[in-house]
């Protein structure tokens, strides 16, 4: 999706029209939301990318790409990330929308 397509879609949304979401846009948004949630939780724990990579059985460049929203991890990797980040990973996925959060485990 290029900028002019996004602008047209946004203008139509603001006008109250129903707008279909391109699957690429939805996937990119989910990847970005997931990356941001991982980054936020990692910083909250005071971990470096290398430390998180070690805990989750990844490499530091893989963590960097994921936090940047450049890749969507597999389900087994999501499980390892939740464990490495000491919490429960919550994914809420709906048509055209997603929400990703970590809920820390009780101490």
Regions from the PLM with identified roles:
Residues 1-36, 99-107:
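N-terminal flexible/basic segments that precede or flank functional cores
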Residues 38, 49, 60, 75-78:
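Helix-turn-helix DNA-binding elements, focusing on the entry/boundary residues of the two helices
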Residues 42, 53, 82:
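The alpha-helix within a helix-turn-helix
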Residues 46-64:
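Short alpha-helical DNA-recognition segment
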Residues 57, 76-91:
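DNA major-groove recognition helix of helix-turn-helix/homeodomain DNA-binding modules
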Residues 86-102:
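Short C-terminal boundary/hinge segments that cap the last helix of small helical domains
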């Amino acid at each position: 999706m290029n900028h002019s397509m996004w602008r047209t879609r946004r203008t139509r949304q603001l006008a109250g029209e129903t707008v279909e979401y391109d699957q690429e846009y939805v996937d990119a948004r989910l990847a970005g939301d997931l990356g941001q949630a991982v980054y936020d939780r990692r910083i909250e724990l005071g971990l470096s990318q290398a430390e998180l990579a070690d805990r989750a059985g990844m490499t530091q460049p893989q963590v960097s790409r994921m936090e940047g929203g450049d890749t969507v991890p597999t389900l087994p990797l999501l499980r390892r990330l939740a464990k490495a980040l000491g919490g429960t990973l919550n994914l809420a996925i709906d048509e055209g929308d997603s929400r990703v959060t970590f809920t820390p485990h009780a101490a």
